[in-house]
């Protein structure tokens, strides 16, 4: 996401300026007189709870702002919206009736996955997968070229296909492949997209500006592999496809894991930036929102969020993601505990490893948040093993759990506001379609799947914002492996029309 800017003078919009611009933001606290150390620590927690507050009125404003940003992002390419609202060119989702064998390639890190999925017209009859490590020399360095990288991937695909029996497949004909490519691309059709830049450990310079589908297709052809890339997608679109395969009422998909994103089904005529010649016969189009970049003055930001943002690799960007995703929740908690330790050193037994950025991970936060032992022994164990803080008192452990609860609750309720914002945008909240049929949101990611209190809080907040009557028609459900199964299903959905 490009850093937010004011068009007149290109002034960067920081988290601080967002908070100051919000009508519902609390005024700066007056300087407090000196207080005993324990009271000072308790004051840190009280101020955190106040700053992270997400009453229904504020969440409603966030949902409305989300819907407004979505509208702006659909209006014009490269406009004022922080949300990119990328047209995926997926205009047909799986129905559950697809048959045959389809393949998927999931490339997004130092390993890639290849899968074969056999569909039996009503379910997945068989799924076979393999994970392949990529040699470091193919990802960066002097020998890292597009031809070598995609050649290696194509060779692994050919080997995988050669070892598989064609049970109910394509009778030796051309095979269909869904390609999940988790790097920024400029997509121009369902099966083409030019690489904008690499992220993570990749630095294959000659691939930038290249059509990654064409590069893979050429490598497969050179190796005699009769396979066609039917769809180029990201994991969020794949999650939508996977959810749609099992439930025809799925209208949106959300990733809540290390990162976060959302995709949804839009009325194609509502996409003003789409040329009339590009309107699909189905009149629907899946939109990749890139909602992690969403920013609004009424997002409840704290001093800890602002410091994290300024010290990040992308200050002023990905505001929403830094508040709700698994990558950052542990780090926010760490920063709060570090301040508590500075105010009351005896409470947490000294700082230990608290000064080390990102040493506390969200799974650690979840484990402490869910601790129901009488003496909060799990909290004590985590503090000792992860942070080197020994001999904590029950009072200190309760304070740590409270901090975890505040940070996770804010994240869950803001995620709920985003979901409601999408439902508002497509008319599934007030009247119309929302009154007549179910609206299902498929969610993937470890934060939602494994952090029970986060999940329950988010679901409760969705019901709170919608109201009981509307909430009866909205379902939030888990949908796994969008990057693998979802890619194969999109390939199946698009090959059926070929």
Curated annotation (Swiss-Prot):
The keyword ATP-binding applies. It comes from the Eukaryota. Pfam families: Hexokinase_1 (PF00349), Hexokinase_2 (PF03727). Its EC number is 2.7.1.1. GO terms for molecular function: ATP binding; D-glucose binding; fructokinase activity; glucokinase activity. It catalyses: a D-hexose + ATP = a D-hexose 6-phosphate + ADP + H(+); D-fructose + ATP = D-fructose 6-phosphate + ADP + H(+); D-glucose + ATP = D-glucose 6-phosphate + ADP + H(+). Coiled coil: none annotated. GO terms for cellular component: cytosol; mitochondrion. Plants over-expressing HXK1 exhibit early leaf senescence phenotype. Fructose and glucose phosphorylating enzyme. Acts as a positive regulator of leaf senescence by mediating glucose accumulation and inducing an increase in reactive oxygen species (ROS). Belongs to the hexokinase family. This is Hexokinase-1. It comes from Oryza sativa subsp. japonica (Rice).
